[in-house]
Design a protein with these regions (language model features):
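C-terminal segment of classical bacterial N-terminal signal peptides
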Residues: 14-21
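Repetitive, compositionally biased segments used for assembly/scaffolding
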Residues: 22-148
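Bacterial N-terminal signal peptides that target proteins for export
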Residues: 1-8
């Protein structure tokens, strides 16, 4: 009986945890590589302006200048999150200069040109030579996750 209750409890906890992961929508990779089909720089792949969930679609939830989930809205409150190839959080893909996690905040951890975690630091996270850097034209880039 104890084993059954323990198994059911573990199952419920794991399903709740996996259910939280299912809420994140994969929006591709922030990358300068135009040949990678998952790159936002590929106009025929994830970066297509006609794709409903593309950050390059000005009428979609992630590309509209009016959506709170948008990368182009300077007042966005729920912009997509960035993760590198090791799963480390790299800030929010947002033009909001006031959001502390935004890559557009020049004084924040993820937007400062002096922070090692910033995409704007050419010697840190934004190095054009790192294989997973978004600024490497032949690299993989960082994963973009939106919320449903």
């Amino acid at each position: 009986m104890k084993r059954l209750i323990f198994s059911m409890g573990a199952f419920i906890l794991l399903s709740l945890q996996w259910g939280g992961w299912a809420l994140a929508e994969d929006l591709g990779r922030l990358s300068a590589n135009p040949y990678n089909p998952e790159s936002t720089s590929n106009p025929y792949g994830v970066g297509s302006p006609y794709r409903a969930d593309s950050i390059n679609n000005p009428y979609g939830p992630y590309g509209s200048p009016y959506s709170p989930k948008s990368t182009t809205n300077p007042y966005a409150t729920d912009a997509p999150k960035l993760y590198d190839s090791q799963g480390n959080y790299r800030g929010r893909l947002s033009r909001n200069p006031y959001d502390p996690d935004s890559i557009s905040n020049p004084y924040g951890r993820y937007g400062s040109p002096y922070s090692p975690d910033s995409i704007n630091n050419p010697y840190g996270g934004g190095s054009p030579y790192a294989a997973d850097s978004p600024n490497n034209p032949y690299g993989r880039g960082w994963r973009i996750e939106g919320t449903d």
